[in-house]
Structures are given as C-alpha cells and as structure tokens.
Amino acid sequence: MEIRRRPPNPSVKVAHLQYAIPHADAEPRHILEKIVWEKDREVETARQRVPLETLKSQIADLPIPRDFIAALRQASRAPAVIAEVKKASPSQGVIRADFDPVLIANAYAEGGASCLSVLTDKSFFQGGFEVLVEVRQTVGLPLLCKDFILTPYQLYQARAAGADAALLIVAILSDQDLTYLSKVANSLGLNVLVEVHDAEELERVLNLGGFPLIGINNRDLTTFETDLETTETLSQQFATRLQQQGVLLVSESGLFNRADLDRVQAVGAEAVLVGEALMRQSDVCAGLQQLMIGDEGTSNS
C-alpha cells in the first residue's frame, strides 16, 4: 500500500503578493492518508515553534531511557501488556470523556501493565506531547510514544517528552525512511516498535533486519476495521523468520478479553497492546487485571 505524502501547493506571484494554489487532486484517499497529510502540517508548525536545537538541549538533561523491550521480556504474566492512554480515535470518537492521564497511568501501573503506550497525536486522537509529559512524571514504567512518525524531529519530540520507545508504522514509511528513523531513535536511546498490518509490510521489515520488536496491527488503518486473524495469519506465515531474528512479537488492537489474549499468544505473540477495551472500563485497574487473569481471577475471588 502506497501512502502519498501531502503535495506542496504551487504558488504564483501577483504584484507584490504570493498566493498558494491548491492542487486539483490534493485530497487524501482514505483516513490514513488524511492523518499523514495533517501530520506533515503539524510537524511544520511545531518546528517553527520549538526548534530542533531547543529539543536537543532539553534531552541533554534527561536520564537514560528505560528499556522497553526488556520490560516486556521480564513480564511476570504472559503475554505482557502494553496498556494504552488514549482519549479518542477517528473511528470511535471520544472513548473516555473523563480522561485523566495521571489517574489512568497510575491505575495501569497498579494493575500490572509492563509498559504504557501514550497517544501524542492531537488532531485525530486528542492526545499530545503534554499528555506524555504528564504520564512520564507519574509512573516509572517504560513509555511508548504512539504517533504517526514521519521525521526525525518527532523522535526528538518524543524523547524530550519522556518516551522510552517510539512507534514506526511501516505503511507510511519507505524502507529508507524506516531504516533512517530507526537509527535516529536508537541514537536517542529509544527502542522502536515497528508496526505492520500485512504480509508485504512484514516481509519488508524482515528483509531489512535488525528490528527486535515488531507489532502486528489487527486494525487496517485505511478503514479502521479490526480482525484478530491478522496476527494469526502473519505470525504463522513468518514464524520461522521471526524466530530466527529473535523478534518479540506484539499483537495490537481488537483485544478485549483474556480469550483474545490466549488466541494471539497461541500463535507466538509475547505481548499485546490494548487501548479501547481498557479505556471503556469504569475501573481501569480492575479491568486490566481481569483482562490479564480472565476466569482465573473470578474463580479465586
């Protein structure tokens, strides 16, 4: 799947005024392309407001990032859970009206999450880097910056806000960009979670090599529909190569109960990323524990 980047608008000069002329075909074809185009604009604005050198100076004073991958491998209960701090999504709208990142992060930590994922996209998920900062100040768990990362600048933003890992979505990146952004992330001490959705994307990642943490997103980002068979199909199709490269496999999206966790764990997922199912719980801590323990928890209560 090819995701077009937002074309720059040509300009014409009339007298002393410069006008931008929108492209006739400058319309995104689906929601993912719309998000990417908006992200391009968002990053341009952020660069003007906070120069890269400012972010670098902020990072210089920060402690070394936590080891996101090690935290998943050392989880006391399998699969390890990456619990997500998410207020809204393009498909569901506002998921949690009483959104308090501090309370949610504390509940996740108490409930037994191995790591947290924090949405920093503002336009479509109502997140922000300020949310990541709040969560970082609240808990000691490793944090994933979950965003549509297209540029090195965003990785510096993530690191400055307290992230320990960053999401790189294969569908929106070329092989060259994926490799380069991964190197930049690693130079900042960030682990990388590389996200794929289909066989072509996973093939690309495995051919490049050097990605120890791969997430299979059960959600098609062009339609936002989910299907757990995505994890089952890809993990089995590429089982040998995943094992040969020592990949820690994460199943993302569409996971709502312990049976779902068992289903993806049975095909090799060592970790899961869960957001909506937990954000809809009135008691987030209890919801996380029930997700992790399932019937075992009710039988012992």
Swiss-Prot record:
Pathway: Amino-acid biosynthesis; L-tryptophan biosynthesis; L-tryptophan from chorismate: step 4/5
One Pfam assignment: IGPS
Disulfide links within the chain: none
Catalytic activity, EC: 4.1.1.48
GO molecular function: indole-3-glycerol-phosphate synthase activity; phosphoribosylanthranilate isomerase activity
SUPFAM superfamilies in the cross-refs: Ribulose-phoshate binding barrel (SSF51366)
PROSITE patterns reported in the protein's UniProt record: IGPS (PS00614)
One GO-annotated biological process of the protein: L-tryptophan biosynthetic process
Record's catalysed reaction(s): 1-(2-carboxyphenylamino)-1-deoxy-D-ribulose 5-phosphate + H(+) = (1S,2R)-1-C-(indol-3-yl)glycerol 3-phosphate + CO2 + H2O
Top-level taxon in the UniProt lineage: Bacteria
Statement: the UniProt record of this protein carries the keyword Lyase: yes
Keyword Amino-acid biosynthesis: yes
Keywords, comma-separated and alphabetical: Amino-acid biosynthesis, Aromatic amino acid biosynthesis, Decarboxylase, Lyase, Tryptophan biosynthesis
HAMAP family listed in its UniProt record: IGPS_B
NCBIfam families on file: PRK00278.1-4, PRK00278.2-4
Family affiliation: Belongs to the TrpC family.
PANTHER family (UniProt xref): INDOLE-3-GLYCEROL-PHOSPHATE SYNTHASE, TRYPTOPHAN BIOSYNTHESIS PROTEIN
Identification of the protein by name: Indole-3-glycerol phosphate synthase
Organism field: Prochlorococcus marinus (strain MIT 9313)
